[in-house]
């Protein structure tokens, strides 16, 4: 399976609540996001075996703010996937925004440990995305709910990472203000593809700001100018996002299928 086939396969498995008939040993990854929590299982080669997700707000700007809530959700996802696969999962990997240090960096590991998964490693989110996309040379931009992280790879080696506190939550805040609706309604509106064309003029400045933030993070690194750019994360689902982000960024960007699932898949590959 190539990278995109794996992403399509993972989406199918989550949607149908089924498991692929692939032998173990298995790897587990847990992505604790600002807007969602995703648990993914792959085989040793990184092929998706099963997965589950929940929309939840247990992390803010890359930091766990609802430890108990996060742990309960991971427990539920773990139980769901175990029931689908008919096995017990005992260890897993998780991820953090680049530059997260100290207790904040340890929190994600504590969450999955509390849910019954022994933490085996913790990886930067955009690095996980690069792993899922099988990128050895390029720039990966991971736009989460509260943070935007980037990873630059050269000949398979990580040569640069950075992170800024901007993301999909800011899109929802702008929608809430523009339409005078609660934040929760704005989140639902943002996820409705039928409304994307209508809301694009409202949220375009936020997308342009995200592109500018990434551009500024890469300022001074002229050697990266010809590197392909991949954008992942839930915000990249927005219809027109790829075009508008690319315009503001000044370069063509690539949005893979089901961009919300790219980082969780990559985390599992590190498990």
Would you name each region that the model predicts?
Residues 1-34, 38-143, 157-271:
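Nucleotide/phosphate-binding catalytic cleft detector across ATP-hydrolyzing
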Residues 146:
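Short glycine-rich anion-binding loops that position phosphate/pyrophosphate groups of nucleotides
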Residues 149-151:
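A structural feature that tracks compact, well-ordered secondary-structure segments
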Residues 154:
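A cytosolic small-molecule/anion-sensing beta-strand core signal
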């Amino acid at each position: 399976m190539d990278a995109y086939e794996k992403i399509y396969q993972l989406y199918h498995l989550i949607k149908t609540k089924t498991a692929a008939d692939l032998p173990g040993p298995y790897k587990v990854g847990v992505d604790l996001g600002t807007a969602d929590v995703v648990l993914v299982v792959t085989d040793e080669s990184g092929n998706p075996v099963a997965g589950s997700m929940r929309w939840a707000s247990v992390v803010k700007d890359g930091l766990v703010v609802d430890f108990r809530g996060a742990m309960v959700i991971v427990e539920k996802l773990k139980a769901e996937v175990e029931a689908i696969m008919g096995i017990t999962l005992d260890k897993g990997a998780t991820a953090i925004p680049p530059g997260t240090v100290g207790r904040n960096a340890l929190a994600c590991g504590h969450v999955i440990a509390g849910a019954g998964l022994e933490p085996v490693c913790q990886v930067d989110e955009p690095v996980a995305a690069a792993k899922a996309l099988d990128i050895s040379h390029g720039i990966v931009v991971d736009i989460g709910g509260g943070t935007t992280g980037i990873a630059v790879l050269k000949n398979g080696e990580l040569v640069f990472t950075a992170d800024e506190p901007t993301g999909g939550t800011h899109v929802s805040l702008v929608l809430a203000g523009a339409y005078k609706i609660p934040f929760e309604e704005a989140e639902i509106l943002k996820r409705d593809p039928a409304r994307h064309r209508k809301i694009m003029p409202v949220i375009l400045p936020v997308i342009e700001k995200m592109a500018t933030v990434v551009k500024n993070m890469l300022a001074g690194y002229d050697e990266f100018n010809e590197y392909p750019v991949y954008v992942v994360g839930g915000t990249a689902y927005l219809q027109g996002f790829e075009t508008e982000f690319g315009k503001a960024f000044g370069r063509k960007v690539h949005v893979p299928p089901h961009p919300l699932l790219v980082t969780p898949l990559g985390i599992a590959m590190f498990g």
